[in-house]
Structures are given as structure tokens and as C-alpha cells.
């Protein structure tokens, strides 16, 4: 450094300006809210010394507190002062299933949520059990006790004296208004949470009748119970009227086509008395299908029977019948909360009036797919196409704007004057084999939209009868919507009762 030069120190001050991060607009980027609660030592001991949080349901604990702090007070369902007169399940027994429709129709627990319950099995009269003890009676409450606990249904006239599986809880009440009142409670989120846990909030996977002694319910005056009960019973009566109209429509269809009983339609085997089905198919009839189930003779016999008295037998893909058959593509789903999505459910809940376990698809991420493939419209026909093939449902008004998953195809009718007729045919026992014959897949059964479009559908000579069939089904579908509104009216009133907290709480 030269003589006389000075050292100069330069100081630089840097101002830090924090970057303002924009709050995430989509709720899917937000962390899941933390759930927490306290559990006493006594609760842990009663729950088998379980220390893992998954063994306890925090929401169920909160639900219990809510009911017990209700302004009306509470009462346990079962007990000396409870609402239930009797609750029981049947005795276990070895079932002898048959394929003979003349045997005893047998309903399974999974059937009780269906808007039109139909027996899916038959058991032999030789079954070693007291069949009469399995019959249900009018104004019983039925409840599933395992699997999905707490599914409920009310027995009305159509199901009176029907034989149900032993593993359903049958409940009778002391007062007639308690039936609809308890049903409404069990169809609220609070009621279901309490039922699916024990009295300490521990998670359970099976219930017995005595479990109901630990289920509290608001102890409202009879006037309130009566209002809720009447709405629920009216809902169930509307369902029965709806099913009566569908029966009437389908009977008109069968009579006009002069169809024999489906159980009498049998195909001929190439060689009888061999113990298995065997038949001959011409090469020009193979239709590129070498699987025997596609060519079962019963299918051809059904088509022959239908063709005899029909004006014409066309296919579901005919543009006079449907404007579009939609098979949604598979996709990775992004679920959000109720306020930011569209209701989304699957084929398992297809036959329910009000599907349970509904999730919500993100509108932000799936808008195009929802609008073009998934969205439901009133009077569409929904057909399951994966797993259990051929379950049919006509879309009611309250499902409009909801979505179904890719395991259910949508048949969009050409117009309103054919929409109900499509359902009347597809939901018949004559159409089901025509759908199922198209099944393919080694592990999971599947059919696609092209195959569904080839399913035969008859057009009637008498167009007035065909129109009447259509109108009866559409009227039935409207009654289902009214039944839904009545049930929701009762459930909403029940929720208001549950939310009415005592000032002393």
C-alpha cells in the first residue's frame, strides 16, 4: 500500500423483506385438522388396555356428550325405562341354499338398505332351524350388527313375514311413535357414531342387543316423536307405492309380450344328464367370444320368447332408445370436504334411496371429467359394469348433479317418453342374463359400453301400453324423490333436537 493511503471500510445494510406467500386456494392443500381428546384410565382398562388412539373415536365421545347435555334430557334405548320393548337376533344355523325359486326367499343384511328389497337367495325348507323365528313383522326396526354397523330399515307391509338372515337385529318398541323417532336418530351422524362405539367411545365391530342399553337418545315429548315418526312412515309408504307402480309397469310389459315365467325358460343341452351344461355353437355365431358363458342357451331362448310378440327387437344402442351410453375412464380421485366438492358414490350404494358413505370429488381438479362423464341426470339408467354386473337404478331427482364412479355406466335415454320403459326392461329378470352374458375378466368381472349397447330391448306393438309402462316408472321415480324429502325432513328435525343443548351444560 502506498504511503498516505487510507483504509476505507464500506458497510452495506441489506433490508430483508419477507416473501408474502399466497394462501392456498384449494382446501386439499390444507392440513387435516388435528383431532384430540382425553381418555381416562378407566376407559383404557374397559377397552382391553388399548393405548393406541385408533381404538377410540373422538367424534363418538363428543357425540355422547352432546346427547347427554341435551335440553330434553336423555334416555337409554334399552332398559326398564327405555324405548325398546324387545331386541333380538336369530339363532345361528347352517343354511341350505338352493336355486329353486319355489323354495324360501331369503333376505341378507345387505338387502335392507335397498329401496326395492328383493331376496337374493333361496333356502331349502329342509334347513334345520325355526324358519318362523326368522320372519320379520310389520313395524319392526331392522339393524345390521356387523360389517357396516347400524344400517337400518323399517318393515312395512311388503316385507311382512319375509325371511331375513339371523344376523340382523330385530327391534320392537313400547310406543308406536318410538319406531320412526329411533330410526331418524340412527340415521343422524351423532346417532350412528354412538351406536358404532361403546359407552366409553371405543371402536367396536359387532353389536349385540344388550349394547343398546348404553345408547342414549334425547327424551323429547311425544308430540315431537309423533311428527318425526309420521314423516318416516310416510317416506316408507311412498317407497312401497313406488315399488307397486314398478311392479304394475313390468307386469304390463310381460303380459304384452306374453312372456313365460323366467324360471321356466331353459336352454337345451347337446347331451342331457351329463351333470354340466353343454351345447353347440356355429362358427358364425361366436362373435369373437370363445367363453362358454357368453353362449348359454337360455339367452337365445329369452330372445326368441321376447321376439314372438314384440313389434321389433332392437338394441340399447339404437338412437331411438338412448342418446349416449357413458363408461367413465379410470382416474385418480381427489376428495375434498362437503363445501368444496360434488357428492360421489359407487355401485355398492346404487340401490339405496339415500346412499351412505358419500365422498366429495374436487370440482377444481375434476370439473371436466365430472361434466362430461360422471354427472348424473334425472331418469338416466345406471348399470353396474364391474364386480357385481347388472345392478340397475333409474336416477331419482335428488341425485341430479351427483356423481357415480367409473364402475357404473350411464344410459342416457333418447327422450323422456322412453326413459322409464328402458328401466322397466333392464331391471327385469329377462334382461339381466342378456347383460351378464357379456361379462369378461379373469379376476374382476367387467362389461363395457360397446357390449351394453348390444343388449336386446323389445319395442311393443301397442304403443299406448308402452307409453303407460314408461309413465308408471317415471311416476314411481317421482315418488322416490318425495320419499327422500320426507325422510330428510325427519332427520333434519332430529338434528335440531340433538343440537338443542341444555343451558345447564
Question: Which ranges hold each PLM region?
Answer:
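Short, surface-exposed loop/turn microsegments at beta-strand edges and helix-strand junctions
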Residues: 96-104, 113-116, 120-122, 134-136, ...
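Non-catalytic DNA-recognition/assembly elements of restriction-modification systems
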Residues: 1-93, 221-331, 463-505
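Ordered, small/hydrophobic-rich secondary-structure cores
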Residues: 1, 145-148, 156-157, 163-165, ...
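A short beta-sheet element
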Residues: 131-132, 145-184, 346, 384-425
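A short glycine-rich beta-alpha junction/loop motif
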Residues: 161-169, 201-223, 402-409, 440-465
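Short hydrophobic-aromatic micro-motifs
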Residues: 105-108, 141-144, 343-346, 381-384
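Sequence-specific dsDNA recognition surfaces
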Residues: 75-95, 110-138, 314-333, 348-378
